[in-house]
């Protein structure tokens, strides 16, 4: 099968969030399962130094907002990506400082709507074999609002490829004014709320993808159900319920890249291990190595006190406010230590910094992001904390399972689908892999942490829990096979 994978970001070329991790891994997984895959993405100014073998393949002209834009399409390769990358080069739209969506002042680029609408038009031309590439896919997979218009544009075509639109996060709707809709020359039949892409007198590119793709997928089975409820759908529950009723909305779990996240080979950790070899000793040594980052006294580093790690954005969605509420009393009442790595809301950063000064040997923080430290925490912590209020899929809990670091999670989205709670029954049957709380409250979080600390003291039970988690299969191959089963049924 020929698959065109359209995305606005891909690791290691450019990354602002989890979409980049998916885009950097899922097309490769298709390729390794013998599919013919091309990835297409904008040629941002920062990308050129990260690619090699660049060659111009074609050029074309795209009309938008009263002007003709000259487009060059290049093919390139990149370390860590095994499929050809088609770069859509439109300098006036994409050769800019800052990240793909934000200017240097942290605000959205004023013309984001035009930028990604034009990119979507180019993708549609490629899909229809009108871009001079002499290649037409059987199926186009698009991702989030930035490529939402592709599916809509292809509904205007005869003999078109099938389309799948994948939702990674409903929180970003791609809302733009009616003037852009007019400037793009889109059909007026689309300017209505029920079967079109109008959303409260704006155009929603996210809604375009949901409404007009042949199939809609999202990144976990539970999130696929959650987004049909108002608290998760941001006003789009009606169209999502319609797609669910049509049998055209499905959740497929993301995977993890075992070339990057693997305790047997991880270049960021000092002591390697596997589920059956060296795990207990290596995790103790990795804990000491992790704690050495903070120049702690030897007595602290050598202590066998439990350490709970957290790596993530310090924002309400991630439940950081709940963590801040329970930290002081857990530190006062138990022997647990916390390691927190992340950046986010300035208030949360300040509060964590103050608590770290108050408990210098019990709470270690790093405000910022460090890839090396993130790996060290996964390998060195005894437990990993992920109390997100919502989480479409989540990756850190998957890393934690792979590293034998049982996660503590709130029951939502992909966290519900990937962590089996350590109840008495699940422990007895060998199914438990972590700890789950069901109410996003300080009481539920604290009691679950206390339960985890109790089990940590029971070494035999704890080692079984670690092994259960490490034996789970959350590979991208597993995810890709599920997508391909869907694609083959469509095509």
Swiss-Prot record:
Binding annotation for ADP-alpha-D-glucose: 15
E.C. no: 2.4.1.21
Keywords: Glycogen biosynthesis, Glycosyltransferase, Transferase
GO molecular function: alpha-1,4-glucan glucosyltransferase (ADP-glucose donor) activity; alpha-1,4-glucan glucosyltransferase (UDP-glucose donor) activity
Reaction it catalyzes: [(1->4)-alpha-D-glucosyl](n) + ADP-alpha-D-glucose = [(1->4)-alpha-D-glucosyl](n+1) + ADP + H(+)
Pathways per UniProt: Glycan biosynthesis; glycogen biosynthesis
SUPFAM superfamilies in UniProt: UDP-Glycosyltransferase/glycogen phosphorylase
Cellular component GO terms held in the UniProt record: cytosol
GO terms classed as biological process: glycogen biosynthetic process
Keyword Glycosyltransferase on entry: yes
Keyword flag Amino-acid biosynthesis: no
Family affiliation: Belongs to the glycosyltransferase 1 family. Bacterial/plant glycogen synthase subfamily.
HAMAP family linked to this entry: Glycogen_synth
Free-text function comment from the UniProt entry: Synthesizes alpha-1,4-glucan chains using ADP-glucose.
Protein name per UniProt: Glycogen synthase
Species per Swiss-Prot/TrEMBL record: Hydrogenovibrio crunogenus (strain DSM 25203 / XCL-2)
Gene designation per UniProt: glgA
